[in-house]
């Protein structure tokens, strides 16, 4: 059970880290749009995915650690 949860979390973070498309912000449409500085949910997700890209080396090391754990600890 714990191994399944760790594997799920690892795969989810890997999927976010290897996304390779441009994440653009929506351009303002009107005159007063620059006054609105509230971040939407889409903006927060975009920032999170962009921050994951900077941690690719740590994610790779985590993957190696997880492979080791799957062989040694969770193997039958």
UniProtKB/Swiss-Prot annotation:
Keywords: Membrane, Signal, Transmembrane, Transmembrane helix. It is found in: Membrane. The chain crosses the membrane at residues 55-75. Residues 1-17 form the signal peptide. Residues 76 are cytoplasmic. InterPro entries: SMIM7. One of its GO terms (cellular component) is membrane. The keyword Membrane applies. Residues 18-54 are extracellular. It is a single-pass type I membrane protein. Belongs to the SMIM7 family. This is Small integral membrane protein 7.
